[in-house]
Amino acid sequence: MFKGFQKPKRLVANTETLTERYGMFTAQPFQRGFGTTIGNSLRRVLLSSIEGAAITAVRIEGVEHEFSPIPGVVEDATDIILNLKQIPFKISSDGIKTVRLSVDSHGDVRSGQIETDADVEVLDRDVHVATVSEGGKLNIEMRLKSGRGYVSADKNFDEDLALGYIPIDSVHSPVRKVNFAVEAARLGQMTDYDKLTLEVWTNGAVSPQDSIGYAAKLLKDHMTIFINFEEVPEQTEEISERGMDKMNEVLNRSVEELELSVRSYNCLKNANIQSIGELVQKTEAEMLRTKNFGRKSLNEIKEILANMGLSLGMRIDQHGRLVAPPPSAGGGPDFGPEDDGQDQIGE
């Protein structure tokens, strides 16, 4: 039922720009339309469903409600709470954790001054929290909890919340931003495939690579209930599907990557053969009719292609996939699926 349905073989990361908080990834080729389907699905799950830590309640000494001013502190409780929400945390254990911030000297108060235990990490230690005036002080207790997505202050209210704690709304997602783009991809002679590019920004609690993995696993787990049949492995005929997939990976590569001699490469260039996919579809007879192309160049190309699991005289179907070559015609050799690709031409 799904034979010939094109799917990407791997996800490729841009290693030049990859960091702990940013990653750009590409996957291709998808059947037309599936780049958008997969990209949009991953984006929605990445932004809404990856688990992360956030402050769910705050207790500020001398403050009864979130609109109260704080003696000796420039900001009021509302401003301080807004600043606290910007601090990214990472929790390595289950349950609720409590962290504290105590300042009794004047100056700028930063997130790096928060006191934590071994299970809690402040991922950005330079977030501004408050400004304490001369003679002022600031004492804050914060409750941290793991969760997913947005949680309102009402849902963060617990019956066991100690007196003086103010429940606040929280955003738990460690993924800050996701972009995706879909453009045309080429496979062999076919150009109606999709290439998906995905960009992910996180707060450092989870890497971009891992966040994509978690999102894909969530989607997979939700989709399995819709499969109402046993999957039957695809039967191979003349050439195994695994072998064909490996061959297809090199079709888009330029003939420049074959490291041919200058003479052989120039002959291919003059014949307007630019990709390996175009080359393998040529027969020996066709190649020998190329201007200045002789037996030595032919044997060189055959040897290099054989080392890659390819040969001359192969066919590419309408999906851009290699299929077994037909019996030879017009003087070309017959390379069956079990052929080792060595020169069989008699002199």
UniProtKB/Swiss-Prot annotation:
Molecular function as annotated in GO: DNA binding; DNA-directed RNA polymerase activity; protein dimerization activity
Pfam family, one: RNA_pol_A_bac
Coiled-coil regions listed: none
Example of a GO biological process term: DNA-templated transcription
Record-linked HAMAP family: RNApol_bact_RpoA
Subunit structure: Homodimer. The RNAP catalytic core consists of 2 alpha, 1 beta, 1 beta' and 1 omega subunit. When a sigma factor is associated with the core the holoenzyme is formed, which can initiate transcription.
Protein name: DNA-directed RNA polymerase subunit alpha
